[in-house]
Amino acid sequence: MFDAIIVGGGPVGQFLALAAARAGRHILLLEAKPAGAGFNDDRTLALSWGSWLMLQRVGVTEQLEPAATPILRIHVSQRGGFGRSELTANDGGVSALGYVIGYGDVQRALAQRVTASDVRYHTSVDGIDQVDDGVVVHAAGENIAARCAIVAEGGGPLVATLGFSQREKDYGVHALVARVRTDRSHDGVAYERFAAVGPLALLPRSDSFALVWTLAPDDAQAVLGLDDQAFLERLQRAFGWRAGRFIAVAERGAFPLVLRQSEPRVRDRIALVGNAAQTLHPVAGQGLNLGLRDAWLAAAHLPKLDELDRARRLDRAATVHFTDALAGIFANDWPGLSWARGLGLAALDLLPAARRTFARTLTLGRL
């Protein structure tokens, strides 16, 4: 009998499989898509320093390094108000605040480490039944027994089918994503600029930036429809000139922003991790990193899922609150709040202890 069956072969599911195998667990990973399906996915991921260390422990960072761009400094500011702050790798006591990389690069590196006997592709899970000594997973016409099941697949109906409820908060805005280039080197600097509707982030990736731009839904669609020159001019007005002049744009898209949380995270012998457990606002880039921490602790506690729930509760709650509060504080025009935000950013820049605490939150995911 397997110690655990992992449902979902994205980055969190594959990382969990590797971490569990490293801990001596007998696991099976089930993935609905064919092998290699995500290798050409060029979406941008931001890995914290803490996530990088976990990936190092399962032996994939050597493969990731050629495609990863280190974040050496983060510049935080607000549009139309005073106050700014800069966080450096030195503030966090690390060699990099994080790394920016493509989804496909992470997926490929993890897949190359997962043992072929531990994974089945093209295998959809229809349901999971709990029995006296574990679970029975119904997949592709087969009934597979295990001591527990971990669901890391967040995009399909399985979570609801299993009886988990979901609470959703619609932020009422869209994230416009793209790759943009400027007329000068990024030097490993990431930018987070807050405006009334939400943040505009530039993440250094290779020789360009990954853009995440929060806009009202109608504005997002209008900006998507602009030609390249008009798009770059609109972006320049919104962001300013700190990163240089924007000269090229590619790979545009947009999607609505929501906070989605599944309840409970653990039900007897079934647990949810990653996007199956929660989907966060992208501010501060904490979603994937929280999912990897879920997976790391899950591997350590298998198959005792009640212990996993207790071990993860504080970090999950703190990270969800941190990202939700950060999005809310900066995404409105309440009278006087701009001054309060400015004072907060100025204090962060002037007080080394506060700056180090914030840097540790971003790099290690702990408040």
Residue ranges and their predicted role:
Residues 64-162, 168-175, 228:
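Conserved N-terminal helical subregion
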Residues 222-290, 294-303:
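FAD/FMN-dependent oxidoreductases across multiple families
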Residues 300-367:
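C-terminal helical "tail/cap" subdomain of flavin- and related membrane-associated enzymes
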Residues 55, 141-143, 149-245, 249-252:
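Conserved FAD-binding catalytic core of PHBH/FMO-like flavoproteins
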Residues 2-29:
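N-terminal Rossmann-like FAD-binding beta1-loop-alpha1 element of flavoenzymes
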Residues 21-43:
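Glycine-rich FAD pyrophosphate-binding loop
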Residues 41-79:
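N-terminal FAD cofactor-binding segment of flavoenzymes
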Residues 12, 35, 156:
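Conserved Rossmann-like nucleotide-cofactor binding loop
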